[in-house]
């Protein structure tokens, strides 16, 4: 049972009702998440206002966002996000085999180029998004724990950025990085509050053997 009870529409401030209604229209399956965040008017206004803006206006392919989100959500073991984003990823055209691959690739070792080599079944841009998501997790969580020298992390970061800059615009890079790192925050938020999936959402358990 969730530690915070999601609010109802009648419980939010009048100036949040229009945002609430848009969340209900665009993200009905995430109701427990945004209705919980509504305990803070600041959080729901800025976080969900931003997510709605990104959905409307971002030049980043929705498939790329879903790839990054699934990679990090499996590693951080967020059942809520995995359960919600697995069908969304499939809805962008990813195959079941590709989605299953994303459940395992986050735990692979980073090589000298910050990659795991070829990502079977994914094109060049998609593979680069996988490498970005993996690097964010590795640099922020695993490298410090493993005692990897900061200079090594710095060099790998620069190589990865050069690859990103060759394929994506500065705006796309910023929005990819922001949305991926933001997903980690969502993962930890949901875990800490023991957020329950909505009744209509099929629970997809993350792969506990990886990450």
Regions found by a protein language model. Name each.
Residues 1-211:
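Hydrophobic alpha-helical segments
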């Amino acid at each position: 049972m969730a530690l915070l009870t999601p609010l109802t529409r009648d419980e939010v401030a009048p100036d949040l009702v229009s945002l609430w209604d848009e969340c209900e229209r665009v993200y009905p399956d995430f109701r427990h998440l945004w209705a919980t965040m509504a305990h803070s008017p600041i959080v729901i206004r800025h976080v969900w206002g931003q997510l709605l803006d990104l959905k409307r206006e971002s030049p980043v392919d929705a498939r790329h966002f879903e790839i990054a989100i699934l990679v990090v959500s499996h590693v951080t073991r967020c059942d809520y996000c995995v359960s919600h984003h697995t069908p969304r990823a499939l809805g962008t055209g990813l195959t079941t085999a590709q989605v299953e691959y994303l459940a395992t690739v986050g735990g692979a070792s980073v090589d000298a180029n910050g990659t795991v080599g070829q990502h079977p079944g994914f094109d060049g841009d998609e593979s680069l998004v996988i490498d970005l998501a993996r690097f964010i997790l590795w640099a922020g969580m695993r490298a410090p724990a493993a005692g990897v020298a900061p200079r090594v992390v710095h060099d790998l970061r620069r190589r990865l950025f050069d690859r990103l800059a060759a394929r994506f615009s500065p705006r796309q890079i910023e929005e990819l990085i922001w949305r991926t790192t933001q997903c980690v925050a969502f993962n930890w938020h949901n875990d800490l509050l023991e957020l329950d999936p909505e009744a209509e959402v099929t629970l997809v358990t993350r792969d506990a053997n990886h990450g």
